[in-house]
Structures are given as structure tokens and as C-alpha cells.
Amino acid sequence: MKFSIGGSLKLAFRPWVEGLENIPAEGPAILASNHLSFSDSFFLPAVLDRKVTFIAKAEYFTSPGVKGKLTAAFFKGVGQLPVDRSGARGAGEAAIKSGIEVIERGELFGIYPEGTRSPDGRLYRGKPGGLARVALATGAPVIPVAMIDTEKIQPPGKVVPKLMRPGIRIGKPLDFSRYQGMDGDRFILRSVTDEVMYEIMKLSGQEYVDIYATAAKRQIAEAEKAAKDAAKAADKVADKASDKDGKGAE
């Protein structure tokens, strides 16, 4: 099913790819990508000859009804692996465990170091827990990947994607085997993550923001709420002024 889905995506969207030769023909590797759109996890597997496994929310595989079954079949078809994210710490450990298992099978494991989609198209600080821990626990090479323009195809909240060409740039493998077994050292984890994010930034050309994307989303939500509250307050003041003017005219 993966190949039929991948073939359909390539035919419809005609994604362009650079650096495909950096994906090994065999053996394990970690593909670390920026995350602009829900569709990122579909376009990258579509252009690869090998299966790549990404982590996905368990809800995508357990939703009821016909739509739920179709969604589950689609996610399985493109190589998604369900992980329960209901508990933050437990979810993180489950994702790391799943990633290590994929690598130990000699396969490709895909991960988004930012931990969530970018809220504004910029590249945010990578979280050191997932990517670096899997890399240092296994010694697998890390291949930086940049998704290009996927946020224009399917922005957050948009169900029907826009037909246009996305791009995918694949960088040269990064070797962190010198740190293998040091996945308990938080300074090493931070250093490895930052190096990977720097390579992704060079490939994508994105502006880098040294805060987590989750924090940026909170700031944006708070700013939007403050703007709405201010607008409501202004409307109330205007209504009161209008009422006074009306009474004065009487």
C-alpha cells in the first residue's frame, strides 16, 4: 500500500528531491526533518525507495467508524507507528523505545526534532530527548532533511491540500558514533541536537528561532487571546459611548 500511496502522491504533486544519494541502500539510519505540515510524513516516504517509519498519535489508528478505519489504513500504509501521547513523559519514552527498535531492525527511522509543526514557517530549537537519545543509544547515522513549501500545500487546519510542488533536500549523514552509549549526558544530547538543527537550517534556508516550537505556539495563542479580549473591550466601550450619545440626543 505504501508504494501505491507514494506513487499517487508523486503523480499528483511531483515533489522535487535533492540528495537522494545520501540515503543508504541498506542498514539503519535516522532521518531528522524540519516539520512544516501534516503532509511531511507522507511526502518524504513517497520519494524514498526504502520504508521509513515515523511516530504518529495513537488516535489516528483507533478512531471509530469508516473514516477511522480509512485513516488507520492510510497511516499504516505510509509507515506510521502508533504511540500513545496521553502522558508527556511516558509518550516520550515510548517514542524513543520505538525508534530504537526500528533502528535495531536495520530500518530507517524518521523523526521531527522540533517535536511539533512550526507555527509560522520558521525553524525552532530541537528537543534533545528523542533524536539524540536514539542516535546515541544505537550509533546510527543521522541524516538531516529539509521539507520545502509543504506548509503552503497544507497549512494547519486545512483539510484539502493545494496542488503544488513541494521540495525535499536530503543532507549528508552525520556520524555521532563517538558518543554512543552517552545518551544519559544532557550536555551531549543538547550538542548533538543543535548540530543536527544547524544542518537542517542550512538545507531549508529557514530563519532559526532559539526557543521551542511549543513555547512559540503558546505565545501566539496568548497574543491572539489578548487581541480578542482587547477587541471585545473596545466594542463594549464603543457600545456604551453610543448609548450615551443616543440618550443625549433624546
Language model features by range: what are they?
Residues 10-17, 90-93, 151-152:
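Short gly/ser/thr-rich secondary-structure transition/capping motifs
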Residues 11, 26, 51, 77-78, ...:
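Structured helix-beta-strand junction loops
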Residues 15-20, 40-41, 68, 96-98, ...:
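A generic local structural motif
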Residues 23-88:
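Catalytic core of membrane glycerolipid acyltransferases/transacylases, capturing the structured
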Residues 93-250:
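Non-catalytic C-terminal accessory region of glycerolipid acyltransferases
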Residues 21, 58, 84, 146, ...:
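Residues at the C-termini of beta-strands that transition into short coil/loop
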Residues 7, 21-22, 44-45, 72-73, ...:
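Short secondary-structure boundary/capping segments
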Residues 1-18, 50, 67-78:
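A transmembrane-helix-recognition feature enriched in membrane-embedded lipid enzymes
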